[in-house]
Amino acid sequence: RGDIATDTIVICCGVWSPKVARMAGASIPLTPAVHQMIDVGPVPHFKDTKGVIEFPIVRDMDTNMYERQDGSGLEIGSYAHRAILHDPEDIPSNDEAALSPTELPFTQDDFDKQMEDALELIPDVLNDESVGIKYAINGLLSLTPDGLPLLGETPEVKGLWSAAAVWVKEGPGVGKAMAEWMVRGEPEIDLQSSDIARFYDCQKSRANIRARSAEGFNKTYGIVHPAEQWESNREVRLSPFYEREKALGAVFYEAAAWERPHWYASNEKLLDEFGDQINRREAEWESRWWSPIINAEHLAMRERAAMFDLTAFCIFDVIGPGALECVQTVSMRQMDVGHGKVVYTPVLSPSGTFKSDLTVMRLGDEHFRVVTGGAHGMADMKWYADHAPAGTTVIDLTSGWTTLGLWGPRSRDILASLTRDDMSHAGFPFGTCRMIELDSLRVLASRISYVGELGWELYVPIEQGAKLWDLVWEAGQAHGIAPAGIGVYGTTGRLEKCYRAFGFELDADFTVVEAGMTPPKVKGADFIGKEAHLRHRDSDPLAVLCTLTVEDHTSSSGQKRYMLGREPILAKDGSRLVDAHGRGSYVTSAGAGPSIGKHILMAYLPPENANIGEELLVEYLGEQYPVTVVTNDATGVFDPENTKVRA
């Protein structure tokens, strides 16, 4: 019918979306998968129903099934059968399909067990001999590698948007949110976890899409532990430290397809060293995907030094004419700083809420290096690239560089034994970076800290990473160095300092002011979200990010329980806490504080409850535990004066 010229296209073609996207040179990483459903009836129990739907849907989470009344019939759907995947190219055409292209022939063997479960659940409805199967299909729906929708502008093609992997329950909301995003530049609700730009190239491979989608299918109604790790398609991205880490008994979690140590079995000996300072979790649920070794590694870092594999960072350069303009526009903090300065900055949405937080190193007049979290790194890089003026290039360096973190009171002594460079506080101040020589390596060292200790991030080309590890490890032996995992870096060390994390405390639901991160002054240069941020500064916050400690862990059974995150925070009388914006208070992060001997929680509270010493409750698995507000700003509960970081 001819061509239509347009600047914007939205692909919302369901299971055909990948096929359509490839026509434009983009990737929509989903796979069609079978969801079995049967329609039985007429059901005598429903003979007097007048409407299509008069009874509530029943979700039987234990059997991964649902039952839904439909007129005089009953639909029974299942997520318990084996994962049955298809390729978009193999979906039959309208002419080839017996029913419709997404309604494939029913495979009865896959549903026999589910039918038995449905009969056990509602025998009064299904046991009548007059009830027969009216309709049975292997229907196709869309699965993604992480189980979330694929929304937003594709990173490959400007103006090509995706609204794919959207199930029926999400459809109306997604339509509204996508319209807002396209017209206003952001949706009203937080869709960052569903941003199609979140994937790295290796995560878009057919093998990964199918493996992760198959693994995730049976978890649709499953009980998934907050820290549960993927089992399929592992060891895709390996840091140069990987073999050393394996030899030390590293327990690997995955981050942006990288294998990253969470703790090291070789540090079990530290449990005896620190003894009663380390708590042991008694309940099986919160002991999953956790080890007391994490707390031991934490204490070894606080007392001596620890080294961390930070290769999963996403690293990209903004370089060329207009680079300063680009980073000023995207970053909230002042970027027009001296060469060698390191700036931590929030990245805001137009409405002044959080789009990310990251660090930026100024390496030259028009050369900036951005370091951000691996999980949202690709979306961050796209955001900078979207706002880069002509002549400015955004270059992904993630696979070209590796990062080793070294922190603890002995870290300066360790580096000093390897270099002639001045590593003193005067010679290498906090918040600066520069090239140093460690033995035969030239290393970009950045003096910042996410764990509240003196130390540096050390960057080298990835092929030099093994040498860097060996140098620091050997030099550290005389100082009692320990390898430490992300359990310390991302949880215990961070929480003791009350450092905020994107995706936990920082997201599109809260503002900089509410997060307690208001800078003393606002830079003169314009930046995305500035107008909204100025309004927020002039108004009292509707919520305050606080740090709380748990005062008593004892459950009704006498067993001590430890919160994992996302639990409701309640008033002392057990009533819900809801701020003036309608947001309920809940735990954004939870974890041990080994240095203070307390379990630490972070949560946004209504201002009237955000008082130091305020006694509240946290609800965990149906029971309530007493908690106390210990900070109502960004001051750490450990080393509040920051003397260790700036030693």
List the model feature ranges, each with a label.
Residues 329, 333-390:
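Well-ordered mid-protein domain cores that form the structural environment of catalytic cofactors
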Residues 321-356, 409-441:
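Internal amphipathic helical hairpin motif
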Residues 145-146, 296-303, 347-357, 388-390, ...:
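Short amphipathic beta-strand starts and helix->beta connectors
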Residues 27-31, 187-191, 252:
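A short alpha-helix-loop-beta-strand transition element characteristic
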Residues 198-345:
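Acidic, proline/glycine-enriched N-terminal capping motif
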Residues 1-105, 112-117, 121-129, 207-229, ...:
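Flavin-dependent oxidoreductases
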Residues 62, 71, 97, 101-233:
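C-terminal catalytic lobe of FAD-dependent flavoproteins
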Residues 226-254, 260-262, 289, 363-647:
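Conserved, structured C-terminal
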